[in-house]
Amino acid sequence: MPHSALFAATLSAFKAQSWVFREVPGMEVIEADFEAHHTKVPLHVQVYGDPNIASVVARASTTVPKTHQIQVAELIMRTNKELNLGNFELDWDDGVVMFRVTNIFPHGHQDERILASLVHAAIAEIDRITPFLGEICRTPKGELILLRVTDLMKRQDLLPPAPASE
């Protein structure tokens, strides 16, 4: 089965960035692992050729115990409220936190820069939330009632450093 133009552009974008990736056989899917400031970020890019949609999903390396899911759900909800692009999700059954960003491209206009930007955004957002997830998950179960997510989110020491200007 031939690749869609959008998947070809996605492959080209990954190659242009010199990113190491794996193609999933029989699907228009790329998987990759990125080293970010706080964590390693597994990433999944799926292309839907006919509607010309690319969906990028990055996964947090921290699995959330059921005992801590309410506080993590609050963190995600409050974080999503501030986002302009994409959203965080919590798989309630598995305790997996993901960041998903999707773009619908006009037919005939598969922009590799946009594809690379979607990947960068997903990695950056997972990296940004990772230390906050860690703080929640390290809180002993009996102390969760004392944890104020709004106060946790104000902690600047948990944010990665701002990128150096070029």
Predicted regions and their residues:
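A generic structural motif
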Residues: A60-V64, N103-Q110
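Long, hydrophobic, amphipathic alpha-helical segments used as structural scaffolds
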Residues: N84-N87, I129-K141
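Short, internal acidic amphipathic alpha-helical interface segments
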Residues: A60-V96
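Glycine-rich, often proline-containing surface loops adjacent to acidic residues and nearby aromatics
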Residues: P51-V57, G95-V101
